[in-house]
Amino acid sequence: IATIDCSDYPKPVCSLEYMPLCGSDSKTYSNKCNFCNAVVDSNGTLILSHFGKC
């Protein structure tokens, strides 16, 4: 199972770095920061499906 540490989030601004992650919502997030901010917003219901595009 792929895991990612989001303990340092949310962050007010994310970089434009492109390292796609696929969330359990079948949405592709452009990088860890965008994904982790979404995890925080989801109250932990969003998890990482896999690294790379969905």
Curated annotation (Swiss-Prot):
Site positions for Reactive bond 3: 16-17
Please tell me where this protein is predominantly located: secreted
Disulphide connectivity of cysteines: 6-36, 14-33, 22-54
Entry's Pfam families?
Kazal_1
**Kazal-like domain residues:** 4-54
Q: Which Gene3D superfamilies match?
A: 3.30.60.30
Places the protein is found:
Secreted
Q: Which UniProt keywords apply?
A: Disulfide bond, Glycoprotein, Protease inhibitor, Repeat, Secreted, Serine protease inhibitor
Q: Name one GO molecular function term.
A: serine-type endopeptidase inhibitor activity
Q: Domain notes, please?
A: Avian ovomucoid consists of three homologous, tandem Kazal family inhibitory domains.
> What is the name attached to this protein's record?
Ovomucoid
Organism of provenance: Spheniscus humboldti
